[in-house]
């Protein structure tokens, strides 16, 4: 197999380019943000207003990132003005159709969650008083709405992996581990996004115990991601034949191998773990370090999306 250097746009086997990688990142970030926000909301002491800053952060991040991701996806289509057809003509054997249906249900419920959390700012004192009935639903039916939102968010997070795993002729993508890996990394990104935005913009209402809980949860999720990546490549190697060659090439060939070892394994997985193990308790639980760690994790998750998308399409056996 020839070594490949330079821009990753040069590889003629690549049909999905960087906008898809960014979309996959934003969709996972949205799902992870709302999942971790709901987890915090369900904890004792966080069930009612005034809301913790992490809940506020998740309520903002979830609809904004999925909205931005969908716009990016639409404009990346060869014929973006025909996107509406996906909403009318369903093919239930298509992963794309099932994903669109999940997103079609997910987007409204995260908007209602946002209205419930920011009811005072948006409806009572803001310009969106006409949306107060929806905000009231978020209050009166909080737990059922949150359960539905939580389940849909898991579906959206996993769907980003299913979308790629349906590409049967690409060994690195066509694996059942990918949906779980993308869900886990999306949750990690969502936790980091909530910690970053919560501490930056809602610091006064962000409880230290909630920050500590999510920071510790993210550490566990990162270890789980590393385990999934290990299983992914070991499994491919022991399948033998061209699949083993693809696994070897993806880890050793050109700029994509560098992206994996430096961006995914190094920055995204090893660095947060080492910092959290090596640094004194006072430093690693400070707001400054938590925000820095969140930025590192977000960059690592973005690197993972780019790596899987491009390496999966480049190394095909």
Curated annotation (Swiss-Prot):
Membrane-crossing residues?
A: 20-40, 54-75, 98-118, 147-167, 182-202, 221-237, 259-279, 289-309
| Record-annotated disulphide pairs | none
Quote the Pfam families the UniProt record gives.
NrfD
Name the lineage: Bacteria, Pseudomonadati, Campylobacterota, Epsilonproteobacteria, Campylobacterales
Q: Which UniProt keywords apply?
A: Cell inner membrane, Cell membrane, Membrane, Transmembrane, Transmembrane helix
InterPro entries documented for this protein: Electron_transfer_protein, NrfD-like
Q: What is this protein called?
A: Polysulfide reductase chain C
**Where found in the cell?**
Cell inner membrane
Family under the similarity heading: Belongs to the NrfD family.
Q: What does this protein do?
A: Could possibly serve as the membrane anchor of the enzyme. Component of the phosphorylative electron transport system with polysulfide as the terminal acceptor.
Supply the PANTHER family for this chain: PROTEIN NRFD
Q: Per the record, GO CC terms?
A: plasma membrane
Q: How does it sit in the membrane?
A: Multi-pass membrane protein
């Amino acid at each position: 197999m020839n070594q490949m250097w330079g821009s990753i746009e040069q590889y003629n086997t690549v049909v999905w380019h960087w906008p898809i990688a960014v979309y996959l990142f934003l969709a996972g970030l949205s799902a992870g943000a709302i999942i971790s926000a709901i987890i915090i909301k369900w904890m004792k002491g966080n069930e009612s207003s005034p809301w913790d800053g992490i809940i506020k952060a998740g309520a903002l991040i979830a609809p904004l990132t999925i909205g931005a991701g969908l716009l990016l996806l639409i404009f990346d289509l060869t014929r973006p003005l025909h996107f509406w057809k996906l909403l009318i003509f369903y093919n239930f054997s298509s992963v794309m159709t099932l994903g669109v249906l999940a997103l079609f249900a997910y987007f409204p419920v995260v908007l209602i969650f946002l209205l419930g959390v920011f009811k005072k700012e948006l409806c009572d004192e803001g310009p969106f008083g006409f949306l107060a009935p929806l905000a009231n639903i978020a209050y009166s039916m909080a737990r059922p709405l949150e359960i539905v939102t939580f389940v849909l968010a898991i579906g959206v997070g996993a769907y980003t992996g299913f979308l790629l795993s349906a590409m049967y002729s690409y060994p690195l993508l066509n694996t059942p581990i990918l949906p779980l890996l993308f869900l886990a990394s999306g949750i990690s990104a969502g936790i980091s996004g909530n910690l970053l935005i919560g501490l930056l913009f809602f610091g006064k209402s962000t409880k230290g115990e909630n920050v500590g809980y999510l920071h510790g949860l993210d550490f566990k999720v990162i270890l789980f991601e590393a385990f999934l990546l290990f299983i992914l490549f070991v499994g491919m190697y022991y399948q033998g034949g061209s699949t083993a060659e693809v696994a070897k090439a993806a880890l050793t060939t050109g700029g994509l191998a560098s992206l994996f070892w430096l961006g995914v394994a190094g920055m995204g997985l090893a660095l947060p773990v080492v910092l959290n193990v090596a640094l004194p308790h006072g430093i690693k639980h400070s707001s400054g370090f938590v925000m820095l760690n969140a930025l590192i994790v977000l960059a690592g998750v973005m690197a993972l999306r780019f790596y899987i998308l491009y390496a999966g399409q480049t190394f095909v056996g």
